[in-house]
Amino acid sequence: FTLTTNGMLIDDDVIDFANREMSNVVLSLDGRKEIHDRLRVDYAGNGSYERIVPKFQKLVEARGNKNYYMRGTFTHANPDFTKDLFHMADLGFTELSMEPVVCAPEDPAALTAEDLKIVKDQYELLAKDMLRREKEGKPITFYHYMLDLTGGPCIYKRISGCGSGTEYMAVTPWGDLYPCHQFVGEEAYKLGDIWN
């Protein structure tokens, strides 16, 4: 199984469980504090960066050589997302992923046509920086650059296209179940809850 978490409820018991039972752990961090705290807030509206980063560092250190990824989302506020990836690397994380926001075009977080030039340039900057880090003996992994040219796509990816409902599910803090985190809140896609 894979556990994806925003880190808010991580404690020693969660770390022990995740490292014992989960083949992979995905830790949600959008990068720099000011970027992360724009959208990742608690019920009181306070940013979560200061609370989760030490928990993530502790979990990753305890995890040893088991799989994990730091997974962030870039938006209109940070089309220069390599700064956020490099920040994660500076925090000691080496397994990185950063994906574009998925939202309605009128949402203030939505990427614009003007952002795309900046975004495209980021991938070139990232590749060059990864080579530099490799030469310095401090490599990082970027999930979206991982290619398997010999094995090809897995059969379930050929059939289903993504893991929604077959490979993973989203569980809300209230226990509602959805086939994917992108469906959370869409009543038509609610599968049930953990209570029934």
Question: Which residues fall in each region the model found?
Answer:
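Radical SAM/AdoMet-radical enzyme domain recognition
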Residues: F1-V101
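Flexible loop/turn segments at secondary-structure boundaries
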Residues: L9-D11, E34-I35, A77-P79, A104-E106, ...
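Short clusters of hydrophobic/aromatic residues that line enzyme substrate/ligand-binding pockets
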Residues: H36, C162, L191
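Residues that form generic nucleotide/phosphate-binding pockets
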Residues: K55, D129, I194
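Conserved beta-strand termini and adjacent loop/short-helix elements that scaffold enzyme active sites
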Residues: E99-V101, Y143-Y145, I194
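A C-terminal junction/extension of Radical SAM enzymes
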Residues: D107-E187
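Membrane-interface junctions of multi-pass transporters
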Residues: G185-N196
